[in-house]
Swiss-Prot record:
It comes from Chloroflexus aurantiacus (strain ATCC 29366 / DSM 635 / J-10-fl). The modification N6-carboxylysine is found at K125. This is Dihydroxy-acid dehydratase. [2Fe-2S] cluster binds at C50, C123, C195. It catalyses: (2R)-2,3-dihydroxy-3-methylbutanoate = 3-methyl-2-oxobutanoate + H2O; (2R,3R)-2,3-dihydroxy-3-methylpentanoate = (S)-3-methyl-2-oxopentanoate + H2O. The gene is ilvD. Functions in the biosynthesis of branched-chain amino acids. Catalyzes the dehydration of (2R,3R)-2,3-dihydroxy-3-methylpentanoate (2,3-dihydroxy-3-methylvalerate) into 2-oxo-3-methylpentanoate (2-oxo-3-methylvalerate) and of (2R)-2,3-dihydroxy-3-methylbutanoate (2,3-dihydroxyisovalerate) into 2-oxo-3-methylbutanoate (2-oxoisovalerate), the penultimate precursor to L-isoleucine and L-valine, respectively.
């Protein structure tokens, strides 16, 4: 069979002469119409350093695709900056953008009958958005990550964007002055690349590498290093090879490979958002996966990497000592990865890792040996209780206090909570509740990095709990619980919490409990009324109508289940 399995529908035969005429206008010649047409979904944008370098990577991939015998066609897809929109109404559009990215890539690739897709992305939702599209399309596909930002430096310590968020809390608490705040701001982001710790972007790029849909070692490269450009070019070559072999995305996106990705996220100490995104990718690929599968894998996979936000190092440090392949080799040797999973290169995971050392390098402590983990079990725990009958997600490593019972401090929006923290109204022992911020209620399930960073900056990170039906940034740490489901907007128990109620968060018992009698809860539930939608027109209104529970990945196309 020819390599242009799909695009021949628009390039072959006399009736397609008008189609060919238009393609000639964008560079096709007589000998190009039998070549595979390869889409390059380019997320380049100067909105954010995460995506500022993507144009050059897309160009390198385009050149390589052409040299390998394909016909590349570049098209744009969107991004929003989570870091810039954080703490504002604009953050409601962040998770929405995952769906827009997925829908836009699916739309273009299917409309133009492309034979393969290479997606280039950087900011948080670029990665899952692209993977959801690849899973729906099930054609040869590869992802090129824009790369991580290098750490900033100030007064002998490494800085990331989270340093700037935490500095706001420190300034409000009087722990640093305005000059110190400004200097941290000036040094936190020294150039192009995605946020440098094991936050959401680096977590998801690592997960994609574990899934086999990006090149080995590519997920921790620095955005501004030449090896990243070389990796983009090689990705184009590999994709053309995959088109010739008809190696499609769902051959990589299997139950086993998703279990591999979850294991790698746990070993890295990755973002809570990985739960949401991997559930959504599994849904798009028609692979059964539930929130409880994360808990099962967590209990057997240790945290091996000492990475920010709760650790000391950033992604470039991880790359220097072997990157994700080194972590995967350790897990493979421990029987915690499925080595028979296929990758886009045509090799299995085990074959890909064959030449990777069995142990991490000596004289470093970024990656620990399996026998000396940072934590014996994974860090993303699934909690349940009467406050989260469908489950919720807690990052339980890097915290000193693993259980808290305290009075609820209830806020119906992120802004109200942040104001209370910055004005000193939150005290040690409190359990902060931020609700009506879920997928439907926000809508858009905003990340609560500003409130959690303010709590850390105020010196309350070890003594205040926070629960929300919203999300957390990958940069969040502390005694925090997100993705509470059912959410407040649909009448979940979190909507029934009243100021001063006793709430227990117990990381070890995996419990989130409102300490109120069943009779009182029944009375409150009978009196509860749904709130009118915050938006009645536009994309947020559409999203609120379509989106599923966070426990199902907050997808927008779950219609028949």
């Amino acid at each position: 069979m020819s390599d242009n399995r799909r695009s021949r529908m628009i390039t072959e035969g006399p009736q397609r002469s008008p189609n060919r005429a238009m393609l000639r206008a964008v560079g096709f010649g007589d000998n190009d119409f039998t070549k595979p047409i390869v889409g390059v979904a380019n997320g380049h944008s100067t909105l954010t350093p995460c995506n500022a370098g993507l144009g050059a990577l897309a160009a390198r991939a385009e050149e390589a695709i052409r040299a390998a015998g394909g016909m590349p066609q570049i098209f744009g897809t969107i991004t929003v900056s989570d870091g810039i929109s954080m703490g504002t109404e604009g953050m409601k559009y962040s998770l929405v953008s995952r769906e827009v990215i997925a829908d836009s890539i699916e739309t273009v690739v299917n409309a133009q009958r492309m034979d393969g897709i290479l997606a280039v992305g950087g900011c948080d939702k670029n990665m899952p958005g692209a993977l959801i599209a690849m899973a729906r399309l099930d054609i040869p596909a590869i992802f090129v990550y824009g790369g991580t930002i290098k750490p900033g430096h100030y007064k002998g310590r490494d800085l990331t964007i989270v340093s700037a968020f935490e500095a706001v809390g420190e300034y409000s608490a009087g722990r640093i002055d305005e000059h110190e705040l400004l200097e941290i701001e000036r040094h936190a982001c020294p150039g192009a690349g995605s946020c440098g710790g094991m936050y959401t972007a680096n977590t998801m790029s690592s997960a994609i590498e574990a899934l086999g849909l990006s090149l080995p070692g590519s997920s921790t490269m620095a955005a501004e290093d030449e090896e990243k450009a070389l990796s983009a070019a090689r990705s184009g070559e590999v994709l053309v090879e995959a088109i010739r072999a008809n190696r499609t995305a769902r051959q990589m996106l299997t139950r086993k490979s998703l279990e591999n990705a979850i294991a790698v996220v746990m070993a890295l100490g990755g973002s809570t958002n990985a739960v949401l995104h991997l559930l959504a990718i599994a849904h798009a690929a028609d692979v059964p996966l539930t929130i409880d599968d994360f808990e099962t894998i967590r209990q057997r996979v240790p945290v091996l990497c000492d990475l920010k936000p709760s650790g000391r190092y950033v992604a470039t440090d991880l790359h220097r000592v072997g990157g994700v392949p080194q972590v995967m080799k350790i897990l493979l040797n421990a029987g915690l990865l499925h080595g028979d999973c296929m990758t886009i290169t045509g090799q299995t995971i085990a074959e890909t890792l064959a030449d990777v050392p069995d142990e991490p390098p000596a004289n470093q402590d970024v990656i620990r040996p399996f026998s000396q983990p940072i934590y014996p079990q994974g860090h993303l725990a699934i909690l349940r209780g009467n406050l989260a009958e469908e489950g919720c997600v807690a990052k339980i490593t890097g915290i000193k206090q693993r259980r808290i019972t305290g009075p609820a401090r209830v806020f119906d929006a992120e802004e109200e909570c942040l104001e209370a923290i910055l004005s000193g109204k939150i005290k040690a022992g409190d359990v902060v509740v931020i609700r009506y911020e879920g997928p439907k209620g926000g809508p858009g399930m905003r990340e609560m990095l500003a409130p959690t960073s303010a709590i850390i900056g105020a010196g309350l990170g070890d003594s205040v709990g926070l629960i929300t039906d919203g999300r957390f940034s990958g940069g969040t740490y502390g005694l925090v619980v997100g993705h509470v489901a059912p959410e407040a907007a649909v009448g979940g128990t979190i909507a029934l919490v009243e100021e001063g109620d006793s709430i227990t968060i117990d990381a070890d018992a995996r419990l989130l409990q409102l300490n109120v009698s069943d009779e009182e809860l029944a009375r409150r539930r009978a009196a509860w009324q749904p709130r009118p939608p915050r938006y009645t027109r536009g994309v947020l209104a559409k999203y609120a109508r379509l989106v599923s529970s966070a426990s199902l990945g907050a997808v927008t196309d779950r219609f028949s289940e």
